[in-house]
Amino acid sequence: MSSHIVTPGPYRATKLWNEVTKLFRAGMPLKKHRQHFRVYTNCFTASTAVDWLHELLKNNSNFGPDVTRQQTVQLLKKFLKNHVIEDVKGRWGMEDLEDNSQLYRFPSTSPLKPIPNRPTVMRRKSLSMMDRESFFKFRGSKKFDKETLENVDPETQESPVGSSSGETERSRELTEDDIHVIWKNVTLTHLQKLVGSASLEGVLDPAKVNPQFIVYNMTKVNKHGVVSLEDKTEDLPHWALSAMKCLANWPKYDSDQPTYLGFERDVFKTVSDYFYSLPQPLLTYQYYELFVNILVMCGYITTPKSQPGKRKNQEEPNCPQPAKNPYVNPANLFRSTEYLLLSLIRKEAIDEADSPMKEVFSSKTETKLDTRRVFRGRRVSDGDRLDGSYLDVSQAHKTDVPYGRLRPRSCSLEGNINNCAKSRLFRSSESLESCSSDKSNPETDSPLEPNLQSSLVSINTSGSSVSSQLSADLRRNNSRPARARPRSIGNLFDIEENREMSASSFSVHAPVAEITMRPDSTSSVGFRGLGLSSLHGSCVDVRTGPSFSRRCQSSLDLSKPAPARPPSALLTHQPEQSLLQPSLEQVAVEALQLCTLLLPPASRRKLQLLLRMISRMSQNVDMPRLHDVIGTRTLLVQTFSRCVLSCEEVDDLDELLATRLLSFLMDHHQEVLQVPVYLRNAVEDHINYLKSLSSCPGSAGPIPSYSFCRQISCQEFEQQKLSVSQSALADLLENIIKDKSMSVKEKKKKIKLFQKEYPDIYSRRFPTTESETQLFADKPKIKPPMLLSIKKAKTFSIRN
């Protein structure tokens, strides 16, 4: 018996149940067995059933080879509980099946479960209406075709019989609303299957998802993949878009315009002010929980290494739980048959001919190169810093640097300072050309060989001179009038002036995240050694001296993708374990790809343009420094994190989550914000499947369509309740009176019972006693003629 693929949709677990039970009953071999001196025919042992059903599930296209034997035993227990099978003595209803030689057989009843024709909520409402009090219930013959149309407009019921076939054909056609519902259901089903969750309850409310946004974001895009808005009032204003293009294509954008010192900082502030003026973040408050749970599900968290001799509690907030497997553990006992069946569905990539979801579970193989370097008795140079975060050298002397990953540089704007003049320290006008002549040999064993250290600038100056110079620069920077900002970005620009600074320790108030980029446009964000309660940590970041030239193509438009960049190595101090599991990185990209389709088109367009702008800015070597201390990439992430993700109730964890999400989106914006082709193919396949069912003459029936009653007021309902019920009872009394087949005695009995229960209706029918007596007036009896009786008697006597 051949199997067919159960497509995603409502009642999928029921369809899978029917499919498996059909195949099991049709193919399970039955034999004669002997047990306890008795012979049983057409039965099978439990171990044989487990073996056969296990092979069936592994070879079935709906489940796949990942089905375990324990899951098969659990499914057979559900079969025994639901009377798909029974033991040879006819017992069933319990899940006491074991993988042994116990004998079982198939019952004579059908194990298939009926698929409901309407949602459960409607059924509960209809049953509650049917259970209302109705005192006088009479049985009668009813036409079922009239009952099925009781909720339809009466004008459509009175249509002639000849047009019924045409109406059926028209009802099978898919409307625009039906197509929107298909888009919504397929998208949410793919997202639910991708994250491996039984349901999205508590994270996403499907009723609040607008399917028109999904269709618009999938279809209304330009050649660069950016959403095109029909309503231009929702688009970015012209001045904001021009400012974003200016920063993205710096310095070649509109070079004829006059510029001044600090022009790029003013433009950057203009763009940030615009995004902070929006009423909601770009990912909206509605989907805050959804995006946060995607990060948690994909393991985008850090787990600090436990120190020897200490036992940390896993429940503490500064020790996050390790990432869990997104799929249901097959060893668990499933109390629900639906969860058990859905857990058996195959999880690997499905063939293109079988399902359009061939790309959902594809994971990207990532090569990691670990190297161990120990730095002792060495001063931290300014080239060692990354994104403006530092570590006290006293710690570097005491502690060995653990394993680090070789990763490309996230930005070539930081870490290269001209050492010929101390007065130019931490200024935005510094150039990278000073280290262009100090290129390193690519065949060196370590990024920190002596020939590379010529490109690094040592801060071997007195603590007083460096501290005074830094304080002067900060006071000059803070002298400008600045717009009040939320604390998520305000701490980037505010540095404690009275804090002690030395040549070996510069403590910056805010930057706590190290963000790097991989050669294949993937990324990882390292939050190093920081509990959630203390955000002011310090770390050492060692950056290689050589830098390749990564210049933006200024002739391109802002909406075009950023150019590819060659890889380079970065050895980073990383005292924690892996940050993002490589096997789940592709899952996170595709999950965010589906989640961003739920956004309003205007928010999605702004998110696309913002991510393309900050991605280009972080890669542009010609971009002047936007802050004297903070690195360009860190400044971009911390500035726009609250503009992208934020919740209505601000908590302490909000900033870290928003920073991590924006860092991930920056490095994967081309994959996350592109239109998923597999989703479009899945919707088209589902629509074509429904159309083929409607056009097939031998199909099971039309597509089920639901009709609903017109809502009326309470007063009108009370009037209809009285009038309709009383008229029906009056008709009942009239039928009793006019019934000629009923005897007078029985008729009197029923009329008296009716008079007792409904005196008002009876008094309206018989207002006076005369009308009642007239109905039951005794009719005169006609006696037979006496002569005929005499003749009959005489004749009888003569014959005798």
From Swiss-Prot:
Residues 24-108 form the DEP domain. This is DEP domain-containing protein 1A. Residues 147-173, 306-326, 459-485 are annotated as: Disordered. Transmembrane segments: none annotated. Residues 459-468 have a biased composition (Low complexity). The lineage of its organism: Eukaryota, Metazoa, Chordata, Craniata, Vertebrata. Residues 281-321 form the Rho-GAP domain. It holds the Pfam family DEP. It comes from Danio rerio (Zebrafish). One of its GO terms (molecular function) is GTPase activator activity. The keyword Protein biosynthesis does not apply. GO terms for biological process: intracellular signal transduction. Keywords: GTPase activation.
